[in-house]
Amino acid sequence: MQHSTSEKTRVDPSNPETIPKFVDELPIPAIAKPNRMVNEKYPYYAIEMKEAKHQFHKFFPETTIWGYNGMYPGPTFHVKKDETIKVKWMNRLPSQHLLPIDRTLHGTSHSPDVRTVVHVHGAHVAPDSDGHPDAWFTRNFKIRGETFKQKVYEYTNHQMGATLWYHDHALGITRLNVYSGLVGFYLIRDPLEEELQLPSSEYEIPLMIQDKSFNADGSLFYPENTNPPAEVNPSVVPAFIGDTIVVNGKVWPFLKVEPRKYRFRLVNASNTNGYTLKFENDHPFYQIATDGGLLSEPVKLNSLALEPAERADIIVDFSTLNGQSLILKNSNDEGDLGFIMQFRVVLPLSEKDMSKIPSSLCSDEPLTEEMATKTRLLTVGATIDQYNRPMLLLDHRMWDDPVTETPSLNSVEIWKFINTTPFAHPIHVHLVQFKILHRRPFNLDRFLEDGYIQYTGPAIEPNDNEKGWKDTVRADPGMVTSIIMRFENFTGDYVWHCHILEHEDYDMMRPMKVIE
């Protein structure tokens, strides 16, 4: 498809209606390479966070971003299950932030503007390597947060093969650092997956979906204040959804594929936006994995809902679509945000497709309610702050309030999220993978009046594609969402929070301490 110079001059990055779709090929992020360290027993990686220029669209000017090794998304880690690696995450960023900072939020009033700490999302890891929000550090580790312990993080990868991702987690500015580009894939490889003959190598493609807005000069746009404006300026906003879709760092890209099966590793890395993904002609696909790894068996789907931070591995069979193009859509939106990317089935089949969609994937280890030694009731709610802005809270507490979730090592607990707000919240618990038990409607007015949970209907089982291991769960409005999990191998300080980043930063995050 040819595009003229005059078309380029008509493109206004701030106006999505002027941006042609499907003109940039989907990039595949570079693979992270270990630095060979003589004295190191384990593969050792040195990753630098740097400011860089990035081309979001062929008709955009270059955009200043922050990226791991100056790339957006950052380099993809390919690690083996049970193989320990070490990573030195280094801040080489300038002292001034790309985006407006609200200094009324936790962690921002007396701290440097540019702070970073890396969380591998979904990793089963010791607390000193988890990327605690207060373990932040500035350029060259000059200033460090109160829970900072070490410059080199250790990941044992003692968990199922899974699509994880890494991103910034600095207290009070996570939404800004992630939006600026500090995200990447972290893929754990499992021998079991090779035995299953799933699509692999160049037929296994990671897809990181985000939304962005741009100024007319191509720079990243992020709102400085609410509408109408709060008396604080800059001010956090209660939600932010950009007006373009970005996949692997490109605005509305396309991918050329062969007429065969592909595995796509999907990550919703957006700040606020949830997606319901489907192909324009209802072409079916098979979900084979959730956040924490393989499902017990594939689930055939025509659409897939992904909240921020949720992942899904899917297999799409293009074999009957030779010569055709297929648009992946977001059925949550009628406008430009309804388009994700395009697949063009135009490459010749390089060899016979020997990959499979197995009838069963892996055996499951059940967690039953009888195993739980404690059940916690946790309210998902909101209040109004001193500046008349909405402030989201977990269990009526702020980040700085004393820790109240203190599970014991090796214990099994049930957590029930009672959502009193009018929208869904993706709740992420660090350290663990959990199972969703059910969601159940309750009488909101009665609960707000006297705190009593009066159920108004039967418990609703999770959908088949939600029955695998999860680290992020959609807590629906007007529902009590119950999860069950075991706390094993590590004790110490972790967190749990809403993964709508504007909520996490204000003030929907709580400490969690695993005790002996």
Report the location of each language-model feature.
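Extracellular/periplasmic metallocenter environments
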Residues: 93-97, 107-194, 302-346, 421-425, ...
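Active/binding-pocket-proximal capping segment
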Residues: 280-293, 420-463, 501-504, 513-516
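Beta-strand signatures of extracellular beta-sandwich domains
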Residues: 46, 117-119, 276-278, 426-428
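C-terminal substrate/ligand-recognition segments
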Residues: 364-369, 374-436, 441, 469-500
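N-terminal, post-signal-peptide metal-ligating segments of extracellular/periplasmic oxidoreductases
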Residues: 1-120, 124-143, 150-152, 229-264, ...
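Surface-exposed acidic, glycine/proline-enriched linker/cap segments
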Residues: 144, 233-246, 450-472
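Divalent metal-coordination and catalytic microenvironments
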Residues: 47, 87, 118, 168, ...
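Histidine- and aromatic-rich segments of cupredoxin/plastocyanin-like copper-binding domains
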Residues: 125-142, 209, 213-216, 221-368, ...
